[in-house]
């Protein structure tokens, strides 16, 4: 994990600054116990090699454990371990420095930066880091005061570093809770970090994960979790995740979205929205596949209540297409009068004055054949709606078709007329008022 501290501290040469500080103190007051102590310390001022610093500090500590400059020595240990890349020792040294000055900027920043790199960070380490983040967030101005920051940091540099430090401490507070598996608290802290700085791909991912981890008890959080995953996967600006991580996360998002929603419908819109905004809009939701199915069933039930003929047909078709459909037809439907059904005209035979109609109830190609007791008048264009009742005579499963014998007098919706009827209708005079 890359931890960007940039302008949090201007401390790359803090060892030199501390040396100058000690030298200044040496001129002002006799803090050295004797010249031998100063001679023991002096090699630190003559090199930039942290290995020499460490060897010198160890000798100094061994020979003068109660030095009046022990607090300065602890700060030098901190910088030395940091320069050597010894994260655990730097972390512990920072804790020692904070005992001297709880607002020491360099020590606090070392702790919140190093906690990510400890392998692993134990409960005590997390407690220490939590106290550091609390101090930073509660007293940012205080820890950037001249007496607490590196001597070479200017007021302008301090002012520029404060917002970045606030964001860093805030996301670290969330990471600590996330590492403890206190996902509800982590969610709150990560959301605060996003509000402070929306351009944080890693934090967006952590926030999504913290919300998803609560899925068993709070399944309603899953859609928003998917949003933050989409944000982390699609955002490619400053502080975004590496391209390889975004690619892997995109693959995960595609799978998770499909599993949750039941299809990829709306996924591209989700990604586009997340790319442009770090947080979801008010009222944001993604319907789950279960919710969609529930709504479909409810809508179907409501439709069946208002369209009983469609409900009847659905039940009949389900019974006929079942493995025992043939038996069902022979014992329950054949030669029985089936109540009124409704379908759209597909074909008539013959086209004019037909005695046979093909209707579509569900299948647009037709799933009902009506054999009439006589010819209907004229002809009718396909697509018109016809209601009928009739006696079931036969059926086939593939293609599905049920054949009824129907009394044409009980047919509703046929609009065809014979030629003589049309002529009589057209010959009628219209009397206009005088």
Model-identified regions with their sequence ranges:
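N-terminal leader/linker segments that initiate helical-solenoid repeat arrays
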Residues: 22-76
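Structural register within alpha-helical repeat arrays
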Residues: 40-43, 76-77, 111, 166, ...
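Short coil/turn linking the two alpha-helices of tandem helical-hairpin repeats
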Residues: 44-45, 81-85, 112-123, 175, ...
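Short solvent-exposed coil/turn linkers within tandem alpha-helical repeat scaffolds
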Residues: 63-71, 99-106, 141-165, 193-200, ...
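TPR/TPR-like (Sel1-like) alpha-helical repeat modules
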Residues: 116, 127-141, 212, 218-240
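OB-fold and OB-like single-stranded nucleic-acid-recognition modules
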Residues: 267-434
């Amino acid at each position: 994990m890359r931890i960007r501290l940039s302008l949090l501290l201007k401390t790359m040469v803090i060892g030199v600054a501390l040396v100058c500080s000690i030298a200044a103190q040496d001129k002002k007051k006799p803090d050295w116990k004797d010249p031998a102590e100063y001679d023991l310390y002096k090699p630190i001022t003559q090199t930039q090699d942290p290995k020499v610093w460490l060897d010198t500090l160890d000798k100094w500590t061994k020979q003068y454990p109660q030095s009046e400059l022990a607090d300065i020595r602890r700060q030098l240990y901190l910088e030395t371990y940091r320069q050597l890349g010894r994260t655990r020792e730097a972390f512990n040294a920072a804790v020692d420095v904070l005992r001297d000055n709880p607002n020491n900027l360099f020590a606090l920043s070392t702790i919140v930066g190093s906690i990510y790199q400890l392998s692993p960070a134990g409960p005590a380490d997390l407690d220490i880091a939590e106290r550091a983040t609390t101090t930073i967030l509660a007293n940012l101005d205080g820890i950037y005061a001249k007496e607490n920051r590196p001597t070479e940091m200017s007021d302008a540099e301090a002012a520029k570093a404060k917002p970045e430090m606030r964001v860093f401490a805030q996301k670290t507070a969330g990471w600590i809770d996330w590492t403890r598996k206190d996902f509800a608290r982590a969610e709150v802290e990560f959301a605060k970090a996003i509000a402070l700085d929306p351009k944080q791909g890693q934090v967006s991912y952590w926030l999504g994960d913290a919300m998803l981890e609560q899925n068993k008890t709070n399944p309603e959080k899953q859609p928003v979790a998917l949003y933050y995953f989409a944000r982390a996967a699609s955002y490619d600006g400053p502080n975004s995740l590496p391209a390889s991580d975004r690619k892997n996360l995109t693959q995960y998002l595609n799978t998770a979205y499909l599993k949750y929603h039941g299809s990829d419908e709306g996924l591209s819109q989700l990604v586009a929205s997340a790319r442009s905004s770090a947080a979801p809009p008010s009222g944001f939701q993604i319907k789950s596949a279960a919710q969609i199915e529930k709504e479909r069933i409810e809508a179907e039930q409501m439709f069946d209540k208002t369209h009983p003929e469609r409900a009847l047909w659905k039940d009949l078709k389900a019974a006929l297409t079942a493995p025992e459909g043939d038996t069902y037809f022979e014992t329950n439907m054949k030669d029985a009068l089936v109540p009124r059904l409704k379908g759209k005209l597909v074909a008539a035979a013959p086209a004019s004055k037909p005695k046979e109609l093909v209707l579509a109830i569900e299948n647009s190609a037709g799933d009902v054949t009506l054999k009439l007791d006589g010819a209907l008048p004229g002809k009718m264009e396909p697509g018109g709606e016809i209601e009928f009742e009739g006696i079931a005579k036969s059926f086939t499963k593939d293609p599905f078709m049920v054949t009824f014998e129907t009394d044409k007098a009980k047919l509703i919706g046929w609009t065809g007329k014979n030629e003589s009827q049309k002529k009589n209708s057209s010959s009628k005079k219209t009397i206009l008022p005088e």
